[in-house]
Amino acid sequence: QDAKADAIARALEHDLANRSDVAEDAPLAAFFLPNGYALGAGTLSHDILVAGGARNLSVELGFQGNGTLSLEQVILHQPDILIGSQTYPGFSLSEDMVRHPSLGEFPMMHTSVDWVCGTPLVVNAIDEVAAQVEKLRDRTGN
């Protein structure tokens, strides 16, 4: 099992090493989870986002670890992508602001179990971000 684990670890390290740094003009993404919860520098989610080729609004606003964004901050900074969690039927006050009608025009992607732990599955999350970045670039011509 050790050899198999080493091979998986090497493959993951190789995949991550072959990703380029995020360009200054890369799409801007905002983590906007229930209650405005946002993730900044020093989090796995931020690392996934950057490895996928997007900038993180929370980091540009100086967030270290986690914090909160207001609806007004999100609208003011006009991120290219909103990243939220899956919503479920019913009503939750914590989800009220992330369902606000003013956010309807923003492309939205949802985190999944691939974002949770630093396992080789994070490559799936990175690939999801990269696909969204590519889709935005195709649409805008950048």
Give short role names for the model-derived ranges:
Residues Q1-N142:
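N-terminal ligand-binding lobe of clamshell/alpha-beta domains
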